[in-house]
Swiss-Prot record:
Gene: rnf152
Organism: Danio rerio (Zebrafish)
Membrane-topology annotation of the record: Single-pass membrane protein
Function: E3 ubiquitin-protein ligase that acts as a negative regulator of mTORC1 signaling by mediating ubiquitination of RagA/RRAGA and RHEB. Catalyzes 'Lys-63'-linked polyubiquitination of RagA/RRAGA in response to amino acid starvation, thereby regulating mTORC1 signaling. Also mediates monoubiquitination of RHEB, promoting its association with the TSC-TBC complex and subsequent inhibition. Also mediates 'Lys-48'-linked polyubiquitination of target proteins and their subsequent targeting to the proteasome for degradation.
Protein name: E3 ubiquitin-protein ligase rnf152
Transmembrane segments: 162-182
Highest classification ranks of the organism: Eukaryota, Metazoa, Chordata, Craniata, Vertebrata
Length: 198
């Protein structure tokens, strides 16, 4: 229940969007908190801002915007900590070797967290690389390796086999379609015979 109230405290109770750098938590004179976007919309339709809960009036001097209202320091400290700890994963497909780059969790000073490899190759040639140090390390089947020799061979073999299989599959499909066309052509030439081409 406490996490539910904490979660609702981190979102604007008007639009139900989470507070962020774009939607800053602004304190009204009555100490209720709303996001800056909702307050700006309220300010467009009214000269004064009335709290949606207690109807208390918050005056903003002419020429000033909602951004001049004080931020809610409690909520602001929570969202700044949570936003700095989060990272958005970015997946990049590398067509040369079929690897995908995934983000690596880093410490505040930019070093990898203890016990976390800077790069590893997982199933289906998925790789995670830390590009900050300029080196590529690969986690093989037996642990963290220094180079990429063995894994490069595996990736090259996988890519080669994928190409060979694709060529064989396309050739098989073309031969199958050619057989259908030749069969239909032979049936057309025997149009008036007693034997059916079924």
């Amino acid at each position: 229940m406490d996490s539910l109230s904490q979660s609702s405290r981190l979102e604007c109770q008007i639009c139900f969007n989470y507070f962020s750098q774009r939607r800053l938590p602004k304190l009204l004179h009555c100490q209720h908190t709303c996001c800056s976007v909702c307050l700006s919309q309220m300010r467009l339709s009214q000269r004064e801002i009335r709290c949606p809960w207690c109807r208390c009036v918050t005056q903003i001097p002419i020429g000033l915007s909602v951004s001049h209202l004080p931020d809610d320091p409690e909520v602001l400290s929570v969202i700044s900590v949570s936003q700095s700890s989060e990272h958005t994963p970015i997946f990049i497909h590398l067509p040369n070797n079929g690897c995908y780059l995934l983000p690596v969790s880093l410490d505040t000073d930019g070093t990898p967290l203890p016990g976390q490899p800077t790069c590893h190759v997982g199933p289906k040639s998925i790789g995670v690389f830390d590009v900050s140090d300029g080196q590529n390390h690969v986690l093989g089947h037996d642990g963290l390796g220094d180079g990429m020799e063995e894994e490069e061979v595996v990736v090259v073999k996988t890519t080669a086999w994928t190409g060979v299989c694709t060529v064989l599959l396309v050739a098989f499909i073309l031969i199958f379609l050619l057989g259908i066309v030749l069969h239909n052509m032979s049936c057309v030439s025997k149009r008036f015979t007693i034997i059916s081409c079924g």
